[in-house]
Amino acid sequence: MKNIDDLVDSASDLAQRGLSKGEIADELNVSRETASWLVERSGTGTEPDTSDDGGPHDIHVDWSAVGRDSNRLYHAGAAMADLLSKKGDDVDLTIGIEKAGAPLATTVARELETDLGTYAPTKHQWDDDESETSDGSFSRNFAQIRNRDCYVVDDTITSGKTMGETIDAIHEQGGNPVACVVLADKRGIGDIRGVPVYSLLQVIRVGSDGDS
């Protein structure tokens, strides 16, 4: 994807396939507000925004060149594991945030010799006309928390809300999140809920909202 029109087209396609705006945000690595704006701009949304305000301020991170190749994906995951290798003692569980965090977490878990779990965040159920009443959940097909120390893995941090939700969910299950790692951090966050966050890349928007 090279321009905003590509993103609008992709958002439109995903919306027509029945994905919620939360899922579209996850697929395009943008905030939920940006995903909503893209869908509305495409004309697929129920109430298109006709105001010409230049759109939301966000950064799109396209790491599909890594994700579509298993060898590149492995090496990216191994680099993320290296960032965590000296963070915490006796950590034996890695939690991947679905969807994109799960394959990265698989490599991290393999490299650090931990069990693997996955968490489906609330945002996958989010849409403009729905309140956020549903909870996220841990998949029963993978390892459970069971009061263990764990790492948390995702592809990008946009606002930090999803990572914070996952940390809270781990605490509710009696677990102890020791550290988080992502491919790209768009906020430059050092920690969330007191849990340190590490990233291979920090992608920071420069300029005020009034800049053209």
Curated annotation (Swiss-Prot):
Signal peptide: none
GO molecular function, one term: DNA binding
GO biological processes: pyrimidine nucleobase biosynthetic process; regulation of gene expression; UMP biosynthetic process
Renumbered residue ranges of the record's region Disordered: 38-60
Keyword entries, A-Z: DNA-binding, Transcription, Transcription regulation
InterPro entries attached to this UniProt entry: GcfR_halob, GfcR-like, PRibTrfase_dom, PRTase-like
Domain topic, free-text comment: Contains an N-terminal DNA-binding winged helix-turn-helix domain and a C-terminal regulatory domain (or effector binding domain) resembling phosphoribosyltransferase (PRT) domain.
Family in the record: Belongs to the purine/pyrimidine phosphoribosyltransferase family. GfcR subfamily.
Protein purpose: DNA-binding transcriptional regulator that functions as a regulator of central sugar catabolic pathways.
Protein name in UniProt: Transcriptional regulator GfcR
Upper classification of the organism: Archaea, Methanobacteriati, Methanobacteriota, Stenosarchaea group, Halobacteria
GN (gene name): gfcR
